[in-house]
């Protein structure tokens, strides 16, 4: 991307949290920032130093006493002249200042993610760094925080840049063979020196792309489904683990028909727990649809909690190949050891055995938090572009009969796909979709 792209509008937005609050931060960015400060804040403050000042309306009415910071271009978040107004966080105060800014000629309210979009367009960050910033803001667990910070570092850029340099070197070797095939000091065959490295590179890209599921679990959560017969106590277990009433609990079989979800933070890892419809021969079409959804969700889960009522055992089938924790519920109602073998005996009603169950869940999900320090593709678009890069390399490797010119073109297409991941190559059509996921003011 170019070092700096001129943008005509000056934008502003509330960048801090919901109101009322102790402090509210309004961010301004664009060419008119200096004019705004001169009129509304009594002049420019020293760059990057906080200045206590009155904030004025156009009629010179004092709207608030605030801290003002000025960040001149290009040494700012967006690469443009920027300012921050740290106001008292009352709704009326913030509304008055925002209304005054909206009336200022040349200013408009920022769109979602527009400050970060300008930072990208002005070369202050690449596209994966912007996506990582969005993840950092949304992080709910320690693993998500660590993963977002790793993705916002330059380690990913170094990895992809290294791959692109290898492709550039390979293309240079091929071009040399094409242009100087008759010269004695040029290697006799590009295939002997180039294509073996290209095979290794393709394998590295494929293995990297295949690690996306690890990133997906860190970002979106380790997916757990509670599966069992009607009245096994699935909804009661969901409520007990969530420590709040999420699901309706009744003695009537088939109460749960839609899938209910709750997110938990277990030892720094996000875990998404889903309560599903009881598995049985359905009494009606609506319940049958719920059971169908339950089985489909179990097939997509990372872990199945197979729950059984020890006083009335009935075990549904579990999708093959899925990790399963077998749980005997209502253990408070029996005195003898149940005939069936369970990984854990609990009572969702009294809390008996829940600590042991949480230990088992933690053991099943713990390994994924260790991946938070790795460089992994963390968006579906990354995986798609990595796939395009690998496919182009495969076409070049297998294209011994198509000529070196076309094989070199395959390497160029692979390099372009890698460049699109970080936004170095033609990604204008993606920008609105990516930055619209940010909050206003970021």
Swiss-Prot record:
Binding site for GTP: 231-236, 250-256, 275-278, 329-332
Disulphide bond pairs: none
Entry cofactors: K(+)
EC main group: hydrolase
Compartments, record wording: Cytoplasm
Pfam families associated with the record: MMR_HSR1, MnmE_helical, TrmE_N
Quaternary structure (record): Homodimer. Heterotetramer of two MnmE and two MnmG subunits.
Name of the protein: tRNA modification GTPase MnmE
Species this protein is from: Chelativorans sp. (strain BNC1)
């Amino acid at each position: 991307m170019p070092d700096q792209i001129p943008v005509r509008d000056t934008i502003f937005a509330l960048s801090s949290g919901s109101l009322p609050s102790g402090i509210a931060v309004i961010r301004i960015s664009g060419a008119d920032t200096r004019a705004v400060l001169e009129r509304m804040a009594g002049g420019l403050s020293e760059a990057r130093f906080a200045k206590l000042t009155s904030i004025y309306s156009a009629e010179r009415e004092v709207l608030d006493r605030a801290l003002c910071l000025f960040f001149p271009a290009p040494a700012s978040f967006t690469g443009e002249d920027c300012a921050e107004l740290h106001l008292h966080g009352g709704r009326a105060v913030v509304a008055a200042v925002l209304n005054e800014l909206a009336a200022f000629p040349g200013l408009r309210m920022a769109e979602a993610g527009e400050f970060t979009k300008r930072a990208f367009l002005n070369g202050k960050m690449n596209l994966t760094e912007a996506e990582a910033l969005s993840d950092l803001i949304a992080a709910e667990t320690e693993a998500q925080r660590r993963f977002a910070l790793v993705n916002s570092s330059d380690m990913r850029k170094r990895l992809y840049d290294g791959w692109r340099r290898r492709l550039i070197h390979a293309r240079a070797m091929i071009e040399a063979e094409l242009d100087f095939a008759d010269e004695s000091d040029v290697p006799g065959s590009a295939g002997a020196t180039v294509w073996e490295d290209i095979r290794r590179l393709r394998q590295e890209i494929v293995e990297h792309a295949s690690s996306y599921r690890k990133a997906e679990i860190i970002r979106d959560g380790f997916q757990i489904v509670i599966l069992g017969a009607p009245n096994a106590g699935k909804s009661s277990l969901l409520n007990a683990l969530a420590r709040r009433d999420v699901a309706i609990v009744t003695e009537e079989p088939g109460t749960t028909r839609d899938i209910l979800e709750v997110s938990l933070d277990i030892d720094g890892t996000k875990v998404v727990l889903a309560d599903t419809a009881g598995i049985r021969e359905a009494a009606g079409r609506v319940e049958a649809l719920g059971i169908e959804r339950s089985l489909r969700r179990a097939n997509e889960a990372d872990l199945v909690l197979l729950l059984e009522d020890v006083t009335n055992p009935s075990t549904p089938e579990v999708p093959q190949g899925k990790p399963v924790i077998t749980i005997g519920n209502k253990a408070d109602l029996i005195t003898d050891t149940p005939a069936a073998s369970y990984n854990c005996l609990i009572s969702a009603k009294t809390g008996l055995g829940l600590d042991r169950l949480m230990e088992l869940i933690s053991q099943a999900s713990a390994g994924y938090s260790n991946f938070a320090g790795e460089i992994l593709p963390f968006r579906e678009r990354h995986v798609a572009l990595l796939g395009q890069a690998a496919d182009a390399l495969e076409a070049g490797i297998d294209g011994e009969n198509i000529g070196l010119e076309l094989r070199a073109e395959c390497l160029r297409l692979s390099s372009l796909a890698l460049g699109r991941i970080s936004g170095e190559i033609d990604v204008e059509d993606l920008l609105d979709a990516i930055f619209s996921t940010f909050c206003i003011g970021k």
